[in-house]
């Protein structure tokens, strides 16, 4: 196998892999910590550490008391929590650097284990990584699927080639990691197709592979909650379906028109890949079964754009065959030029990282400050600081907020109980205000703001006008970002709630905040 790499790539092929791995690690490690749900993941991990167990009922929101809540990503959340509490933002960047390197290396390992051609292995690994960082990018549990699913394919390959025990152990381990990392854990069973495309289908091996996955899926505290867990996350909800404002839940082909150029290119490649493979490189059985898997990935992408990653992982064997059909560079000088060109992929991604870094708030992200470089941090921080210092918040106060603010606030001001956060499991009476609405929907839904004690919302939101018009509410502070795209928000409180707490609220003032956010200090000068 190594002889193939020396012949096709060159005698320095190992150094090329090292350089590409380092480039991918750096590109991943420098990616900004801007995922909107990172704050929610850290808060969930904090709750698990405090309680010593995973939650089964709603722990954060007053709008769904006692309703089921499953922290199905608890393993990844604890990993991020450990890194953050140990080394702050640097710890999260380091974890992501290793994850990014793993997303590249696991596909390389799959290619070598599957006897793909060296250049097919490199091309598929780089394309997989490019889609991984373009679509997932930030620190989030879904990123770990870029490691576990390729290794599930490798486990299937080992079993087909006679390494049954090693394949079973690897398949079981990847199923355990994935079921405790992401809701779409059944994708680890996709590689069972590998046993069925053989000229004589290996039914016994396929059954063993499925058993290994099934046993792995049971290794979770939510093993007996799968049906309910799927129900509350995938059934009818205002934030699931055509009205959603959640970008990753938007139907894939609707999102295509305004998606990033990298997502459009990846979509076109995946659409064309079955038709780019010469007939001699696929048997009829492979064309049918791998094609069905490709269609399944296409369906998931059509349902929600976040299905793009699953579509990619389902299409790995087809991508390898398509890449193998590309003519290889024959002359040594051409091989060297091609090898150097592959290094431009992580370098190009690295350049895009620096562009994104320019738009990230500068702050002190530690457990003590509870700040995170979320896109909404710039406008929320002055309001959070005011609430800490002037409202003397005790646990249980009801806060009304909006979908885009909720996840950050759950982490930043954990004493409040919030009406909504970044999860799509809320009843329509709450989530309806966050979905697209038309005149055919009847009166505009604003959510349960009248039942809250305080409210934090964008000034351009319709609820802000309702709060200003309601005599029982008082505006306490306005936060305006220096850059218009960062928005403006307000903090309101019920007058009776303020009175019962003995708080005499001052007249509302306005704070302008740039992207250089100071760490919270003493409350003497809020």
Task: Map each language-model feature to its residues.
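Membrane-interface alpha helices of multi-pass inner-membrane proteins
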Residues: 24-25, 129-133, 154-155, 166-182, ...
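Membrane-interface transmembrane helices that cradle and orient dolichyl/undecaprenyl
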Residues: 150-168, 197, 271-282
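Membrane-proximal, lumen/periplasm-facing interface regions of secretory-pathway glyco-
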Residues: 332-391, 404-406, 413, 424, ...
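Transmembrane catalytic cores of multi-pass membrane glycosyltransferases
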Residues: 37, 49, 183-282, 312
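Periplasmic/luminal catalytic loop of GT-C fold multi-pass membrane glycosyltransferases
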Residues: 412, 431-489
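Short hydrophobic/aromatic helix or loop-helix immediately within or flanking a transmembrane segment
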Residues: 63-90, 94
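Short periplasmic/luminal acceptor-recognition loop of GT-C membrane glycosyltransferases, typified by
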Residues: 388-430, 452-459, 492
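Transmembrane-helix motifs of polytopic, lipid-linked glycan transferases
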Residues: 94-114
């Amino acid at each position: 196998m190594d002889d193939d790499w020396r012949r096709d790539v060159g005698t320095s092929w190992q150094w090329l892999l090292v350089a590409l791995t380092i480039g991918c690690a750096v590109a991943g490690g420098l990616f900004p910590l801007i995922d909107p749900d990172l704050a929610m993941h850290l808060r969930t991990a904090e709750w698990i550490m405090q309680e010593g167990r995973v939650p089964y009922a709603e722990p954060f929101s007053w709008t769904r008391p006692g309703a089921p809540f499953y922290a199905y990503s608890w393993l990844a959340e604890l990993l991020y929590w450990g890194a953050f509490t140990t080394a702050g933002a640097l710890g999260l960047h380091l974890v992501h650097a290793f994850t990014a390197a793993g997303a590249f290396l696991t596909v390389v390992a799959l290619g070598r284990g599957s006897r793909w051609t060296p250049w097919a292995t490199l091309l598929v690994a780089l394309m997989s990584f490019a889609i991984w960082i373009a679509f997932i990018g930030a620190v989030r549990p879904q990123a770990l699927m870029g490691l576990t699913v390729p290794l599930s394919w490798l486990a299937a390959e080992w079993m087909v080639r006679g390494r049954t025990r090693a394949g079973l152990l690897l398949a079981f381990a990847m199923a355990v990691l994935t079921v405790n990392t992401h809701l779409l854990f059944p994708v680890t069973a996709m590689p069972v197709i590998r046993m069925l495309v053989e000229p004589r289908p290996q039914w016994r091996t396929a059954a063993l592979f499925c058993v290994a996955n099934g046993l792995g899926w049971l290794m979770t505290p939510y093993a007996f909650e799968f049906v309910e867990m799927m129900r509350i996350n995938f059934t009818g909800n205002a934030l699931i379906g055509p009205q959603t404002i959640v970008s990753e839940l938007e139907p894939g082909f609707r999102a295509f028109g305004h998606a990033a150029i990298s997502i459009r290119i990846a979509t076109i490649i995946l659409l064309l890949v079955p038709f780019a493979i010469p007939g001699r490189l696929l048997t009829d059985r492979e064309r049918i079964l791998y094609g069905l898997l490709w269609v399944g990935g296409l369906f998931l992408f059509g349902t929600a754009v976040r299905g793009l990653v699953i579509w990619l992982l389902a299409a790995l064997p087809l991508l390898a065959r398509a890449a193998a059909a590309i003519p290889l560079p024959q002359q040594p000088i051409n091989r060297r030029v091609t090898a150097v060109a592959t290094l431009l992929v992580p370098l190009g991604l690295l350049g895009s990282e620096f562009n994104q870094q320019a738009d990230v708030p500068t702050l002190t992200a530690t457990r003590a400050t509870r700040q995170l470089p979320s896109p909404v941090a710039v406008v929320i921080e002055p309001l959070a600081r005011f609430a800490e210092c002037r409202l003397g918040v005790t646990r249980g106060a009801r806060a009304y907020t909006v979908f885009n603010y909720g996840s950050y606030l759950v982490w930043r001001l954990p004493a409040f109980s919030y009406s909504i956060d970044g999860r799509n499991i809320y009843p329509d009476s709450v989530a309806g205000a966050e979905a697209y609405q038309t005149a055919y929907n009847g009166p505009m839904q604003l959510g349960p703001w009248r039942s809250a004690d305080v409210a934090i919302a964008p000034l351009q939101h319709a609820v802000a006008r309702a709060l200003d018009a309601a005599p029982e509410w008082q505006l306490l502070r306005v936060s305006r970002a220096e850059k218009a795209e960062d928005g403006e928000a307000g903090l309101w409180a019920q007058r009776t709630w303020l009175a019962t707490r003995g708080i005499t609220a001052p007249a509302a003032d306005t704070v302008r905040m740039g992207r250089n956010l100071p760490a919270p200090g003493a409350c003497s000068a809020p």
